UniProtKB/Swiss-Prot annotation:
Reaction it catalyzes: (5Z,8Z,11Z,14Z)-eicosatetraenoate + AH2 + 2 O2 = prostaglandin H2 + A + H2O; (5Z,8Z,11Z,14Z)-eicosatetraenoate + 2 O2 = prostaglandin G2; prostaglandin G2 + AH2 = prostaglandin H2 + A + H2O; (9Z,12Z)-octadecadienoate + AH2 + O2 = (9R)-hydroxy-(10E,12Z)-octadecadienoate + A + H2O
Sequence ranges assigned to domain EGF-like in this UniProt record: 35-73
PROSITE patterns tied to this protein: EGF_3, PEROXIDASE_3
Activity modulation comment: The cyclooxygenase activity is inhibited by nonsteroidal anti-inflammatory drugs (NSAIDs) including ibuprofen, flurbiprofen, ketoprofen, naproxen, flurbiprofen, anirolac, fenclofenac and diclofenac.
Organism from which the protein derives: Canis lupus familiaris
Cofactor(s) recorded in Swiss-Prot or TrEMBL: heme b
Note: The conversion of arachidonate to prostaglandin H2 is a 2 step reaction: a cyclooxygenase (COX) reaction which converts arachidonate to prostaglandin G2 (PGG2) and a peroxidase reaction in which PGG2 is reduced to prostaglandin H2 (PGH2). The cyclooxygenase reaction occurs in a hydrophobic channel in the core of the enzyme. The peroxidase reaction occurs at a heme-containing active site located near the protein surface. The nonsteroidal anti-inflammatory drugs (NSAIDs) binding site corresponds to the cyclooxygenase active site. Conversion of arachidonate to prostaglandin H2 is mediated by 2 different isozymes: the constitutive PTGS1 and the inducible PTGS2. PTGS1 is expressed constitutively and generally produces prostanoids acutely in response to hormonal stimuli to fine-tune physiological processes requiring instantaneous, continuous regulation (e.g. hemostasis). PTGS2 is inducible and typically produces prostanoids that mediate responses to physiological stresses such as infection and inflammation.
GO molecular function, one term: oxidoreductase activity, acting on single donors with incorporation of molecular oxygen, incorporation of two atoms of oxygen
GO terms of biological process kind: cyclooxygenase pathway; response to oxidative stress
Protein name in UniProt: Prostaglandin G/H synthase 1
């Protein structure tokens, strides 16, 4: 064939190619789907760890879980026996909240110590120590252990490449957070806590937890500014050395203060130039300076700040009398340790006691754990931070005597504390009921936005579904929304929005769960919250064998102050008169006495 004839055929071939129909395009559903990350199914049970291999394979690490098998579901003999004998959380709660006469007998015997040791070890063992994951690392890493700027997390985040926001269950898009707030969390009518919890408790909860819940606004919700990760009283002394120094008097170990109408109060920002969050227009001399920058928000928070300031300076006077050769620094540091001990004592024996509703009398005794394996170190978890948004406690308005204060009148009220005085506010807050936390629809509209932001934050943190946390803390997952809520109306609405009970989010699940009978909240809040709380309290260094001795607290006097601390002592040893003070509203059948009485000499 000649070269010329070949050249003439090329245009013809090109023309034929152009006239051919294009190859058929397969519809999207006919294409080979991308493999789903197998860990999105949460296949590993009983704290097994899911490790992905390749695109569609996984392996469960069942090491030391007590289970074996591909998904850690086959119990070992000892595990099977233990599970067979272990009562359910609901049965244990019933047992601990019924039969008062039986528990009065137990509380008077050595059995109380045995049960308390069992409670502390069983609860604390549910918290991983050292810490495991954080917002940036869903696997064991040195960064997760060493970088205390992160909150830790108990469960890794939902993998990024899952079919739905909560893994594989539920809808492709989560419900609008504002809609959830309005439908399920907004208060219709104030529901008081049936256990009798009061505002003195509610403000203590806020004041106490703000020493270790200090999310970094600059870094994001997975980071904290409270680098002590526990009860270090940073809300009294500041979370850094510069702030501490601004608040200290540098004389006899004391903190700065001002005297108004013969009473000790925190200094003004003029006297202690630290950052405090007050609205514009409030003069510096009207702003009180304390360890936590947000405590000017509520008079109840500044009430506790004032009480602990007075307590610190009172303890310093007692230590100075016992140790006249001690300098300012040693007096300050020892007083701080005593106040840490007093705080933990009050929290365990009165605060947690009130929350639990147990007839078993809880006991703060670090020596109970000296024979057990226990790590005296703590790391605050983002799940604990999420769980502790207890805004249903807040009432519709605030009463002091016969005077009612709206939120607009109460927030940032800088004169109420000095106008009424500590005693009158303690008495008023101790008599006003707080709201029930669980069960839903009990958050006042003034603070609803905080709950909505909590839901949004949990999505940014990619927290696993509520049922996964129930399994992680030894509870049976709920099978339906009706089982969760105990009623039909909310259950049907939740079903419509989420599509599947296994897609329910962590925080809404905690607040919407049906409460135990006559209780402040439901099973999950107790079973998940208690381990975090007790591990954080008993994991404090002062509870260790090296620290728990008289010399740490300046001798037997300081040691006894820790071991005998009560809420009533905190108030009545730092006021001129002794008001009614408790974490529980008074029994109307027993409370016929005056609102304020003289301090007891036994305090």
């Amino acid at each position: 064939m000649s070269r010329g004839s070949r050249l003439h055929r090329w245009p013809l071939l090109l023309l034929l190619l152009l006239l051919l129909p294009p190859p058929p395009v397969l519809p999207a559903e006919a294409r080979t789907p991308a493999p789903v990350n197998p860990c999105c199914y949460y296949p590993c049970q009983h704290q097994g760890i899911c490790v992905r291999f390749g695109l569609d394979r996984y392996q469960c690490d069942c090491t030391r879980t007590g289970y074996s098998g591909p998904n850690c579901t086959i119990p070992e003999l000892w595990t099977w026996l233990r599970n067979s004998l272990r009562p359910s959380p609901s049965f244990l709660h019933f047992l601990l909240t019924h039969g008062r006469w039986f528990w009065e007998f137990i509380n008077a015997t050595f059995i109380r110590d045995m049960l308390m040791r069992l409670v502390l070890t069983a609860r604390s063992n549910l918290i991983p120590s050292p810490p495991t994951y954080n917002i940036a690392h869903d696997y064991i890493s040195w960064e997760s252990f060493s970088n205390v700027s992160y909150y830790t997390r108990v469960l890794p985040s939902v993998p990024q490449d899952c079919p739905t926001p909560m893994g594989t269950k539920g809808k492709k898009q989560l419900p609008d957070a504002q809609l959830l707030g309005r439908r399920f969390l907004l208060r219709r009518k104030f529901i008081p806590d049936p256990q009798g919890t009061n505002l003195m408790f509610a403000f203590f909860a806020q004041h106490f937890t703000h020493q270790f819940f200090k999310t970094s606004g600059k870094m994001g919700p997975g980071f904290t500014k409270a680098l002590g990760h526990g009860v270090d009283l940073g809300h009294i002394y500041g979370d850094n050395l510069d702030r501490q120094y601004q608040l200290r008097l540098f004389k006899d170990g004391k903190l700065k203060y001002q005297v108004l109408d013969g009473e000790m109060y925190p200094p003004s920002v003029e006297e202690a130039p630290v950052l405090m969050h007050y609205p514009r227009g409030i003069l510096p001399q009207s702003q009180m300076a304390v360890g936590q920058e947000v405590f000017g928000l509520l008079p109840g928070l500044m009430l506790y700040a004032t009480l602990w300031l007075r307590e610190h300076n009172r303890v310093c006077d007692l230590l100075k009398a016992e140790h006249p050769t001690w300098g300012d620094e040693q007096l300050f540091q020892t007083a701080r340790l005593i106040l840490i001990g007093e705080t933990i004592k009050i929290v365990i024996e009165e605060y947690v006691q009130q929350l639990s509703g147990y007839f078993l009398q809880l006991k703060f005794d670090p020596e109970l754990l000296f024979s057990a394996q226990f790590q005296y170190r703590n790391r605050i978890a983002m799940e604990f931070n999420q769980l502790y948004h207890w805004h249903p406690l807040m009432p519709d308005s605030f009463w002091v005597g016969s005077q009612e204060y709206s939120y607009e009148q109460f927030l940032f009220n800088t004169s109420m504390l000095t106008h009424y005085g500590i005693e009158a506010l303690v008495d008023a807050f101790s008599r006003q009921s707080a709201g029930r936390i669980g069960g839903g629809r009990n958050i006042d509209h003034h603070v609803l936005h905080v709950a909505v932001e909590t839901i949004k934050e949990s999505r940014e943190l990619r927290l696993q579904p509520f049922n996964e946390y129930r399994k992680r803390f030894g509870m049976r997952p709920y099978m339906s929304f009706q089982e969760l809520t105990g009623e039909k109306e909310m259950a049907a609405e939740l079903e419509e929005l989420y599509g599947d009970i296994d897609a329910l989010e962590f925080y809404p699940g905690l607040l919407l769960e049906k409460c135990h009978p006559n209780s402040i909240f439901g099973e999950s809040m107790i079973e998940i919250g208690a381990p975090f709380s007790l591990k954080g309290l008993l994991g404090n260094p002062i509870c260790s064998p090296e620290y728990w001795k008289p010399s740490t607290f300046g001798g037997e006097m300081g040691f006894n102050m820790v071991k005998t601390a009560t809420l009533k002592k905190l108030v009545c040893l730092n006021t001129k008169t002794c008001p009614y003070v408790s974490f529980r509203v008074p029994d109307p059948h027993q409370d016929g006495g005056p609102g304020v009485e003289r301090p007891s000499t036994e305090l």
